[in-house]
C-alpha cells in the first residue's frame, strides 16, 4: 500500500514540475522583452505608437439636426498618418494595453456630443477626453504618448470651434428664412381675408333688400285676402242656412215613393205568378209516372233469375264474332316490302341532310356560339377570383373554414363556402397551367378583412337606447361612465330633464322617489381605438344610480341603494355584416359560373352524326310497320280476358238487389211528397191589403222643401265665387312667402359659408401665430447666454475657445519610469500553483495518516462534525496566511499606491483562500479526477493567455476561471472598475469552499473516482 501511495505522489510531482517549467518558459517568451519593446518604440518614431480609440459617444440633436462628434473625431484621426489609430471596444483596448498591443487608449465618453453642443448654456460643463497609457512603459515613451494625445486634442478643438461658428451662421440664415416665411404667411392671410370675408360681406345687404321687398308684397296680398274674406262673411245671412227640420229632403221622399211603388208592383206580380203556376203544374202525371216506375222495378226483380243465362249467351256470341273478324285480318306489309322501304327511306334522308344548307348553317352557328360562350365563361371566372385595383369589390378571399366561422357563419354554411373556395383554387391551378407566368392569377390573401370591418361603426355608429324605471328612497346621484373607445352623441332623460352622454356625475332631485330613465343616442367608434376595441368587440355604457356621501348622518348604518344600469352591446355581427355579404355573394356567383364551366368542359366539337340520326328515324318507321302482328295478338288476348270476366260482370249487374230496393223506397217517398204538394195547391191563398194613401203625405213634404233648397243654392253660388277669389289671393300670398323663404335660405347659406370661411381664416391665423411664436422662442434661445448682463459670458467664451480637455485615467501602480512591473498574469499563475501544492499536501497527509481528528468521537456524536469544521478552518487559515504573504510581496513588486494597498491585500487573501479551499476539496473528494480538473483549469488559462490579442478575446478566455481573476487584478491595478461586487463574490466562494470541505464522503474501497 505504501509503495502504491509513493507512485501516486511521484506522478503528481512530475506533473507539477512540468507545468511550472512550461509556465516559466511561456512567460519568459511572452513578457521577457516587454521593456525592450518600450525602448525600441522610442527609436521607431511616432508611427510605432499604437493608439486604441474607444467611441462610447451617443448621438444628440441640435437645432433639429443629428450630431455625432465621436464619429467626426474618429474620421479626423483616420486622416492622420503620423500615428496608428484603431477603433475598438473598451475590452479589446484594455487587453491591448495589458499585452503590449497598444501604448495609448483614448476613450470618447458617452455624453461627448451632448456636452460639446452647449452653445446656449450659461455655464457649460467641461468636456473630458479620457486616455490611459500602458503599464510598465519607459518614461520617455510615456512622455511621447502624452504629446501625441495633446496634439490630437488640439486639432480636434480647432475643428469644434469651426463647428460652433458654422452653427451660429446657420442660425442666422434660418432666422432670415423664417422672417421671409412670416411675411409670406401674412400676405396670404390678408388676401384670404379680402376674398373670403370682405367681398361677400359687401354683397350681403342686397340679400336683405330682396327679402324686404318680397315680405312687403306678401304682406299687402295677405291684407287684401283678409279684407275680401271678412267682406264675404259679413254679407252672408245666417238665416239663409236655417232649414225647417220638420220636413225631410225631397230626394228622400222621391226615393221612398219609388220604393213603395216597386214593392207594390212586385207583390201583385208574385200573386199572379203563384196563381198561374198553380194552374199549370200537372202533379197527377208525375205521380202516375213514378207509380209505373215502381211497378217496373218489381217486375225486373222477379225476372232476374230467369234472364241470367240469356245475358251470358248473348255476350259470348258477340265476343266470338269479334274474335273471328280480327283473326281474318292480315298485315299489308311483306318482309321484302319492308326492307325495300327501309333502303329507299335511308337514301332519301341521307341526301336531304347532306344537301340542306340551312342545317349546315345552324350547326356552324351552334359551334361558334359554344366557343364564344366558353370564352366569356372563362373571363367571368377570372373576374370573379381576381381583385382589380381600387374599384373591384367582387373578388374572393383565400378564407378557411375557421375564417368563415369567425366571420359569423354556422358550421354547415362554413363547410359550403369552404368547398367553393377549394373549387376556386382548383380552377386557379388549371388556369395558371394554360397561361404564361405573367398572366397567372391568385386568390387575395385574407387578413381578417371580413371579420374586422369597423367602417360602419366608425361612420354610422351603433344606436344606444334604453328605458328604465327606478324606484328608491335614497338615490340622489347619477354617475355616467362611457366606453373610452367610442364617441357618444345623444342624451339621457331623467324625469324629462336632459343630460349629455359623457363621463360625469349628476345630482338628482331628492324629492322624487321614482326616476324614469330614457337613454337615446349614437356611439361611434374612434379611429385610433380600433385595435383595442377588436380585443373584445363590445361597447359599454354604465349608468350608476346611488347616494352621495351624507355628512349630516355619520352614524347612519342603513345600507345605501345602488342601481347599475349597464348597456353592453356585442358588435361582433356588425364587424362582418357588409363585407361578409359581399364575400358570400362573390362566392355564390363564382359557384354558379363554375358549375356551367364544368358542364360545358369536355364537350369536344365533334361533327354532326347524320348516320345515327337517319338510323333512328328509319328504325322508328319500320318498327311501326312490323308491329301489326304484335298488335293483332294483343287484341285477341284482350278479347279472351273479356270472355273470362263476362260471367262476373253479369252477376254484378243482375245481383244488385240492395240498390234496387233502395231506389224503390226513394220513389215511394217522392210519391208521398207530391201528394202533399197537390193538396197545398188545391187551397186558395189570401191576398194582403195595402194602404196606398200614405204616398200622398210624402208628396206634400217634397213640395214644401223645394223653396228652401232653391234659396240655399243661390247663396252657395255666391259663396263659391267669393271662395274662388280668396283662393287666387292665397296662391299669390303663397308665392310671395315661397320667395321670402328662398331669400331666407340664401341668407342662411351665405351666413354659414361666411362662418366656415371665418373659421378657416381663424385657424390659418392661429397656425401662423403658433409658427411665429415657435420661431421667436427658438431664436431667443440662440446664444441667449452669450452675455452675462452687459458683459460677455467668460465661461461660455472659455468653453468655445477650448471646449475639450484631456483626462488621464490614473493607475493604481506607482509607475517610476524605467522600472519594469510584473504582469498580473504571472502573479495569478503563481498563486494558483501555490494553491495546488498546498492542496496536494493536505490530500497526501490525509491519505497517509487518515482524517485529522482534533477531538475524539467517543465523547459525543457531534464531535465528528466539529472535527470537520476544524479541518476546514485549518485549510482556510493556511490559504489566508499564504495570501497575506503573497499579497505583501506583490504589493511591493507592483508598487501599489498607498491608498489602494489594503484593498489589494484583501483581494489577494480572498483569492488565495478560494484557490486553496476549492483545490483541496477536489483532491480530497474526487482524487485523480480532481487533479485532472485542476490541471484542465490551468491549461485553459495557458490557452487564454496565448489568445489574448488586440483583436479581441476568444471563447477560452470567457470559460477560463483564472482569466476572470486575471482581469480582476488588471482592472484594479488600472483603477478601471470598483471592487465592491468582486469582494462580495470572493467572500461567497470562500464560504462555499469552507462548507464543501466540511462534508467529505470517504469511500471504504479505494478506487479511481
From Swiss-Prot:
An annotated GO cellular component: plasma membrane
Biased amino acid composition, Basic and acidic residues: 680-697
Annotated transmembrane regions: 7-27, 822-842, 869-889, 903-923, 928-948, 979-999
InterPro entries the UniProt entry points to: T7SS_ABC-Transporter, T7SS_EsaA
Keyword Coiled coil: yes
Membrane topology: Multi-pass membrane protein
Gene ablation phenotype (knockout): Deletion abrogates the secretion of EsxA and EsxC into the extracellular medium.
Keywords: Cell membrane, Coiled coil, Membrane, Transmembrane, Transmembrane helix, Virulence
Region Disordered: start-end pairs: 680-707
Compartments in which it is found: Cell membrane
Source superkingdom: Bacteria
Record's function text: Component of the type VII secretion system (Ess). Provides together with EssB and other components such as EssC and EssE a secretion plateform accross the cytoplasmic membrane in the host.
Xref: NCBIfam families: T7_esaA_Nterm (TIGR03929)
Family: Belongs to the EsaA family.
Subunit structure: Homodimer. Interacts with EssB.
PANTHER family documented for this protein: TRANSPORT PERMEASE PROTEIN, TRANSPORT PERMEASE YVFS-RELATED
Protein name per its UniProtKB record: Type VII secretion system accessory factor EsaA
Naturally occurring in which organism (per UniProt): Staphylococcus aureus (strain USA300)
Protein encoded by which gene: esaA
Amino acid at each position: 500500500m505504501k509503495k502504491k501511495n509513493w507512485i501516486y505522489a511521484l506522478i503528481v510531482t512530475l506533473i507539477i514540475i512540468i507545468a511550472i517549467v512550461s509556465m516559466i518558459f511561456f512567460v519568459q517568451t511572452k513578457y521577457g522583452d516587454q521593456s525592450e519593446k518600450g525602448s525600441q518604440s522610442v527609436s521607431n518614431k511616432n508611427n510605432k505608437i499604437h493608439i486604441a480609440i474607444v467611441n462610447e459617444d451617443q448621438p444628440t440633436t441640435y437645432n433639429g439636426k443629428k450630431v455625432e462628434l465621436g464619429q467626426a473625431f474618429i474620421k479626423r484621426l483616420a486622416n492622420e498618418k503620423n500615428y496608428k489609430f484603431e477603433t475598438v471596444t473598451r475590452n479589446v483596448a484594455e487587453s491591448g494595453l495589458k499585452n503590449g498591443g497598444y501604448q495609448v487608449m483614448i476613450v470618447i465618453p458617452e455624453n461627448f456630443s451632448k456636452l460639446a453642443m452647449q452653445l446656449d448654456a450659461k455655464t457649460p460643463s467641461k468636456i473630458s477626453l479620457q486616455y490611459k497609457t500602458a503599464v510598465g512603459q519607459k518614461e520617455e515613451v510615456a512622455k511621447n504618448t502624452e504629446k501625441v494625445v495633446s496634439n490630437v486634442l488640439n486639432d480636434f478643438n480647432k475643428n469644434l470651434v469651426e463647428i460652433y461658428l458654422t452653427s451660429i451662421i446657420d442660425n442666422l440664415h434660418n432666422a432670415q428664412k423664417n422672417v421671409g416665411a412670416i411675411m409670406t404667411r401674412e400676405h396670404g392671410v390678408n388676401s384670404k381675408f379680402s376674398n373670403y370675408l370682405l367681398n361677400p360681406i359687401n354683397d350681403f345687404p342686397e340679400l336683405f333688400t330682396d327679402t324686404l321687398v318680397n315680405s312687403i308684397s306678401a304682406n299687402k296680398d295677405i291684407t287684401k285676402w283678409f279684407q275680401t274674406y271678412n267682406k264675404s262673411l259679413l254679407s252672408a245671412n245666417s238665416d239663409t242656412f236655417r232649414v225647417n227640420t220638420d220636413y225631410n229632403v225631397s230626394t228622400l221622399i222621391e226615393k221612398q215613393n219609388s220604393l213603395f211603388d216597386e214593392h207594390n208592383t212586385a207583390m201583385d206580380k208574385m200573386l199572379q205568378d203563384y196563381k198561374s203556376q198553380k194552374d199549370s203544374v200537372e202533379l197527377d202525371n208525375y205521380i202516375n209516372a213514378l207509380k209505373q216506375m215502381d211497378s217496373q222495378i218489381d217486375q225486373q226483380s222477379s225476372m232476374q233469375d230467369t234472364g241470367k243465362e240469356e245475358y251470358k249467351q248473348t255476350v259470348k256470341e258477340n265476343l266470338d264474332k269479334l274474335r273471328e273478324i280480327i283473326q281474318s285480318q292480315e298485315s299489308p306489309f311483306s318482309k321484302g316490302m319492308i326492307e325495300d322501304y327501309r333502303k329507299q327511306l335511308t337514301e332519301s334522308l341521307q341526301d336531304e341532310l347532306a344537301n340542306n344548307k340551312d342545317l349546315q348553317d345552324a350547326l356552324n352557328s351552334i359551334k361558334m356560339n359554344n366557343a364564344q360562350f366558353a370564352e366569356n365563361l372563362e373571363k367571368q371566372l377570372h373576374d370573379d377570383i381576381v381583385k382589380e385595383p381600387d374599384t373591384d369589390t367582387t373578388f374572393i378571399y383565400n378564407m378557411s373554414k375557421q375564417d368563415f366561422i369567425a366571420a359569423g357563419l354556422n358550421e354547415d354554411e362554413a363547410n359550403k363556402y369552404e368547398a367553393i373556395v377549394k373549387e376556386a383554387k382548383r380552377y386557379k391551378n388549371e388556369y395558371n397551367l394554360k397561361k404564361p407566368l405573367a398572366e397567372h392569377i391568385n386568390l387575395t390573401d385574407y387578413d381578417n378583412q371580413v371579420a374586422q370591418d369597423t367602417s360602419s361603426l366608425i361612420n354610422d355608429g351603433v344606436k344606444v337606447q334604453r328605458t328604465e324605471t327606478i324606484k328608491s328612497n335614497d338615490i340622489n346621484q347619477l354617475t355616467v361612465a362611457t366606453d373610452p373607445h367610442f364617441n357618444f352623441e345623444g342624451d339621457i332623460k331623467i324625469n324629462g330633464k336632459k343630460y349629455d352622454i359623457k363621463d360625469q356625475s349628476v345630482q338628482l332631485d331628492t324629492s322624487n322617489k321614482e326616476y324614469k330613465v330614457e337613454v337615446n343616442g349614437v356611439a361611434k367608434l374612434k379611429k385610433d381605438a380600433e385595435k383595442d376595441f377588436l380585443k373584445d368587440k363590445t361597447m359599454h355604457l354604465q349608468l350608476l344610480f346611488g347616494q352621495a356621501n351624507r355628512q349630516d348622518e355619520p352614524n347612519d348604518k342603513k345600507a345605501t341603494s345602488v342601481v347599475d344600469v349597464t348597456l353592453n352591446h356585442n358588435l361582433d355581427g356588425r364587424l362582418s355584416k357588409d363585407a361578409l355579404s359581399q364575400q358570400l355573394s362573390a362566392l355564390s356567383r363564382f359557384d354558379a359560373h363554375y358549375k356551367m364551366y364544368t358542364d360545358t368542359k369536355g364537350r369536344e366539337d365533334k361533327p354532326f352524326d347524320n348516320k345515327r340520326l337517319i338510323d333512328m328515324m328509319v328504325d322508328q318507321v319500320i318498327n311501326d310497320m312490323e308491329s301489326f302482328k304484335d298488335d293483332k295478338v294483343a287484341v285477341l288476348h284482350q278479347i279472351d280476358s273479356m270472355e273470362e270476366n263476362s260471367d262476373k260482370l253479369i252477376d254484378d249487374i243482375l245481383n244488385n238487389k240492395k240498390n234496387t230496393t233502395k231506389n224503390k223506397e226513394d220513389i215511394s217517398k217522392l210519391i208521398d211528397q207530391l201528394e202533399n204538394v197537390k193538396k197545398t195547391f188545391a187551397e186558395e191563398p189570401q191576398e194582403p191589403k195595402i194602404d196606398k194613401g200614405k204616398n200622398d203625405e210624402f208628396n206634400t213634404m217634397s213640395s214644401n222643401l223645394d223653396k228652401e233648397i232653391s234659396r240655399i243654392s243661390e247663396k252657395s253660388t255666391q259663396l263659391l265665387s267669393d271662395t274662388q277669389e280668396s283662393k287666387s289671393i292665397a296662391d299669390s300670398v303663397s308665392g310671395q312667402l315661397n320667395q321670402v323663404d328662398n331669400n331666407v335660405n340664401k341668407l342662411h347659406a351665405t351666413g354659414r359659408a361666411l362662418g366656415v370661411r371665418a373659421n378657416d381664416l381663424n385657424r390659418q391665423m392661429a397656425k401662423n401665430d403658433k409658427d411665429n411664436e415657435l420661431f421667436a422662442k427658438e431664436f431667443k434661445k440662440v446664444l441667449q447666454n452669450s452675455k452675462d448682463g452687459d458683459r460677455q459670458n467668460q465661461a461660455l467664451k472659455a468653453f468655445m475657445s477650448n471646449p475639450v480637455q484631456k483626462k488621464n485615467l490614473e493607475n493604481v501602480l506607482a509607475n517610476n519610469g524605467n522600472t519594469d512591473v510584473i504582469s498580473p498574469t504571472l502573479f495569478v499563475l503563481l498563486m494558483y500553483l501555490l494553491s495546488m501544492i498546498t492542496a496536494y499536501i493536505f490530500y497526501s497527509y490525509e491519505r497517509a495518516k487518515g482524517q485529522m481528528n482534533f477531538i475524539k468521537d467517543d465523547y459525543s456524536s457531534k464531535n465528528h462534525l466539529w472535527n470537520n469544521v476544524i479541518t476546514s478552518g485549518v485549510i482556510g487559515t493556511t490559504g489566508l496566511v499564504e495570501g497575506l504573504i503573497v499579497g505583501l510581496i506583490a504589493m511591493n513588486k507592483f508598487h501599489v499606491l498607498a491608498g489602494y494597498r489594503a484593498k489589494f491585500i484583501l483581494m489577494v487573501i480572498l483569492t488565495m483562500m478560494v484557490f486553496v479551499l476549492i483545490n483541496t476539496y477536489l483532491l480530497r473528494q474526487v482524487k485523480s479526477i480532481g487533479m485532472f480538473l485542476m490541471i484542465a483549469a490551468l491549461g485553459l488559462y495557458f490557452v487564454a493567455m496565448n489568445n489574448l490579442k488586440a483583436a479581441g478575446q476568444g471563447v477560452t478566455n470567457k470559460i477560463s476561471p483564472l482569466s476572470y481573476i486575471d482581469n480582476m487584478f488588471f482592472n484594479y491595478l488600472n483603477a478601471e472598475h470598483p471592487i465592491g461586487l468582486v469582494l462580495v463574490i470572493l467572500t461567497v466562494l470562500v464560504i462555499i469552499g469552507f462548507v464543501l470541505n466540511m462534508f467529505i464522503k470517504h469511500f471504504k474501497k479505494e478506487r479511481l473516482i
